[in-house]
Amino acid sequence: MPYNFEWLPFTADLHINMGILLDPISIMMLVVISTVSLMVHIYSFGYMKGEKGFQRYYAFLSLFTMSMLGLVVATNIFQMYVFWELVGVSSYLLIGFYYTKKEAIAASKKAFIVTRFADLGFLIGILIYGYYAETFSFTPAASALVAAGTMIPLALGLMFVGGAGKSAMFPLHIWLPDAMEGPTPVSALIHAATMVVAGVYLVARMFPLFIGYAPEVLHWTAYIGAFTAFYAASVACVQSDIKRVLAFSTISQIGFMIVALGVCTSINPHEGGLGYMASMFHLFTHAMFKALLFLGAGCIIHAVHSNEMSAMGGLRKYMPVTHITFLIACLAISGIWPFSGFFSKDEILTACFRFSPVMGWIMTGIAAMTAFYMFRLYYGIFWGTENKTLHAAHTPHEAPLTMTFPLLFLAAVTCVAGFIPFGNLISSNGEAYTIHLDMQVATTSIIIALLSIGLATWMYAGPKQPVADKLAHTFSRLHTAAYHRFYMDEV
C-alpha cells in the first residue's frame, strides 16, 4: 500500500518521489522498531536517572527512532538513502553521548567514518541503478534492467557494500564493538534491533532484483555472512567485557540472516522462499531477545558498576528478575525449544542444508559456538565466584521497576514469538509459505546446542575454572589473537 508524491524532478523520465510504503516486511520492521524503542525509552528513565544531558539523550533517541521508521517505510531507494544517512548521524550522536570520555568520542568517530566509506558505495550503486533503470523505485521496468546488462549487478553489489557497513559484515564490522561506549540502552536499540539490521532489510527489500538480475551477488553474500558469523562467534568466546560479548554475538547473528538470504540462489523458487522467510523471522526474534540481553546487561552494569565479568559472579541471588529473564534470552539465542530462537534459527539451518550440506554443517557449528559463549557469559555473571571485595563496597541489587518491566515484557515476547505463523505473513513472492519443521535438522541442532551448554557448564559454572584456564594457557597465542579480535583494528 504505497503513497507517493513527487519530490525532486530530474528529467522527464527520472524523478524522486517521497512517500510511505506499507507491506509485510515494512510493517514487521515498524513493529520491531516501535516495540524495542518503547521498551528502551521506558528503561532509560531508570538507567539514565541523574545523568547529565538527560533531555539531550531523549532528543537523540527520538531522532534515531524517527530516522529508522522513515528508512523502513521508504517507497524508493533514494528516499531510503536519505533516512539511512539520518540513522548514521543519530547513531553517531548516541554513541558519543558521553562526550567527556575519550573512548566514546573515538568510538563515535570510528562508527561514523567506517559506515561513511560503506555508504559511499551505497550512493554510487544508487546512482548507477537510477541511471540505467531510469527510476529509483524498488520495482523498475524489466526491459530497462535487461538493457542495462551487467550494470545492475554492479549497482546491487555496491548497494550491498552499504548494507555490509551498517550491518557490520566483515571486514566493515570494526566499528560495532567500540560502539558499546554509548549508554547501554542505546546498544539495545541501535546495536541489537534496528540500525545493524538495516543492511539485512536492504537486501530483503531489493530481494526480487538480487535473485532475478544478480544471483551471483546474492551467492557471495552467503559466504560473506557465514565467514562473518564464524569470525564473530570465535571472538565472542574469549571476551571478558559483557557488552562486547553481546556486540560480537550480534555480528554473528546478523551473519545468519545474511546467509539465509544468500542461500536462496541455487534452489527452486518455493524453497527460495524458505531462506527469505527464515531471515526475516530471525530478524524479528533476534531483535527481541538481543534487546533483552542488552537491557539485562545494563541492569547488571548498573548494579556492579563494571562491564567486566571478573567483577561479577553469584549475582543470581541479588538480581532474580534479571537472572531469569537473561537466562530466557540465553536459551532463545542458543536455539532451545520452545523459545523463539529455536524456530527461526532452525529454519535458517534447514535452508542452508537444502542449499549445501557443507553450508548447513558450518552454520550448525556456529550455532553450537553461540550456545557455548552465551552460557559462558551467563555462568560468569550469575554463577561462578562472587567478587565479595567489590560487592562489599556496593552491594548488588535488583534494578527498579522502570528497568525490570521492559525485561519482563521482552522475555514474554521471546517465549511466544516462535509460535507466530511467520510464513503466512512474510514471503519472498507474496504467497503464504507453510513452515514445516525439519525434525532431523531440529533434533541435530538442539542436541549440539545442549552439548555446547553442557561444555560451558562444565568449564564455567563452578567457583573455579581449571579447564578453561588450562585451555587458555595451552592455546595462548590463539586465545590472545581472538581476544584482540584477530588484530583487525591494527590491520
Annotate each predicted stretch with a short phrase.
Residues M39-M80, V89-T395, V413, F419:
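Hydrophobic transmembrane alpha-helices and their helix-loop junctions in integral membrane proteins
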Residues H15-I33, M151-G163, I362-A367, L437-L455:
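Hydrophobic alpha-helical transmembrane segments
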Residues M1, Y132-S137, G462-V467:
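Helix-to-loop transition at the C-terminal end of transmembrane segments
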Residues E85:
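Short phosphate-coordinating micro-motif centered on Lys-Gly-acidic
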Residues V36:
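Active-site-adjacent substrate/metal-binding segments within catalytic domains
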Residues V31, T115-D119, Y223, L408, ...:
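Hydrophobic H-region at the start of alpha-helical membrane spans
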Residues R316-H323, L377-V491:
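Cytoplasmic/organellar membrane-interface segments at the starts of transmembrane helices
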Residues M1-L22:
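Extracytosolic (periplasmic/ER-lumenal) interhelical loops and adjacent juxtamembrane/interface segments
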